[in-house]
Amino acid sequence: MKLMDVHVLFSGGKDSSLSAVILKKLGYNPHLITINFGVIPSYKLAEETAKILGFKHKVITLDRKIVEKAADMIIEHKYPGPAIQYVHKTVLEILADEYSILADGTRRDDRVPKLSYSEIQSLEMRKNIQYITPLMGFGYKTLRHLASEFFILEEIKSGTKLSSDYEAEIRHILKERGESPEKYFPEHKQTRVVGLKKEI
């Protein structure tokens, strides 16, 4: 039986990594996609993690204007939530024109980025695609347990090491404008996969 290809938005973190593993175990063929906007090579970490996981990986470069607008929104709103949501929704809209099955690491407990039920319905109907969020049924404690079962993890403070999520390039643009990213992004921990504990 031919496996169905699914294109997974991938940052190299535990959530997008776990999503890819779950989809593989459900019988899909995960292709990992990391989005870059040409600001800095933030995709490097995701490339390393994709090799560890053994999945196909591709970097897609989108228009820098998307993250420039996100930086404008952060300065206007004084916090990053709406901007991160805008970038994520824009990315999904663009990718939905290219791929018939999309997935990401959105969790049940996430606030942003996260599509509402009606937004998911709209995306799937307008673009005639499937949008899968494998982690939506799991809470934080469960995901932490699952990730620790499969992965060797590295935890870093946000902004201290180049990551492959949207935040990295937005932070760089804010710095280019003479703004301090720490003024807008609350301090938080980011976790990335640096090895496997068991075969996937």
UniProtKB/Swiss-Prot annotation:
S-S bridge residues: none
Task: Give one Pfam family, short name only.
Answer: DUF7411
Give the top-rank taxon of the lineage listed in the UniProt record for this protein: Archaea
Q: Which InterPro entries match?
A: DUF7411, Rossmann-like_a/b/a_fold
Which named protein is this? Uncharacterized protein MJ0690
